[in-house]
Amino acid sequence: KLDEVSTGTGKVIPSLHEQVLQSLDGGILAELYVREGMQVKADQVVARLDPTISESNVGESSAKYRAALAESVRLHAEVTNTPLVFPQSLKLWPDLINSETLLYHSRRDQLTESEKEMNQSIGLVRRELGITEGLVKSGAASIVDVLRLQRQLADLNLKLTDLQTQYYVDARQQMAKADADVQSLAEVIKGRADTLDRLSIKSP
């Protein structure tokens, strides 16, 4: 006998002897395909549990997986300084693609603008240094001024290098996390999909 709500164990009575059926996950009985006294073949689907919760879990994990995958693709493009190209599997979610594309261009533009400002400052100091070196030769400026400008120029070059390095370090760290999320969520989806498949209860 199978109750209206199955908590994991039910019984059917074939023509030969009683068999015990078990569901690893349990749940609410949605459909019952056999009656007491019916002959049941091996591996025959005899009942199905309500898939609502399991389908919701699979859908939730799939959405997180797609988001992590899109982020991973963007970050790989940032780290390798290559065009952003999304896999075909994400083409059905244009909002997700648009969001990551906007973020990709925004981050690249911000880096480019910061580099531009830094290079302008470097150019100005380099020009001032050249003029000052000429004045030193004519005795109109002190060597101390040259040394000060050389230190300033070195500091600006170091800041430019740090700016670029930090951008790629951050991107690589985020990429590693996104890649790990993609892998772990793929396993979660696989497990939850298996749970969904087990909602169909079969005879032994």
Segments (PLM) and residue ranges:
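Long, charged amphipathic alpha-helices with heptad-repeat/coiled-coil character
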Residues: 82, 86-89, 93-204
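Short beta-strands and strand-coil junctions in structured, solvent-facing domains, enriched
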Residues: 18-20, 54-55, 198-199
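N-terminal or membrane-proximal amphipathic helix/coiled-coil initiation segments that transition from
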Residues: 28-109, 116, 123
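Aromatic-capped interface at the extracytoplasmic side
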Residues: 1-15, 194-200
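Ordered, soluble secondary-structure elements with a strong preference for glycine-centered loop motifs
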Residues: 23, 55-59, 176
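Short, solvent-exposed beta-edge and connector elements
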Residues: 9, 14-36, 41-42, 46, ...
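Structural signature of transmembrane alpha-helix termini at the membrane-water interface
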Residues: 2-3, 76, 164
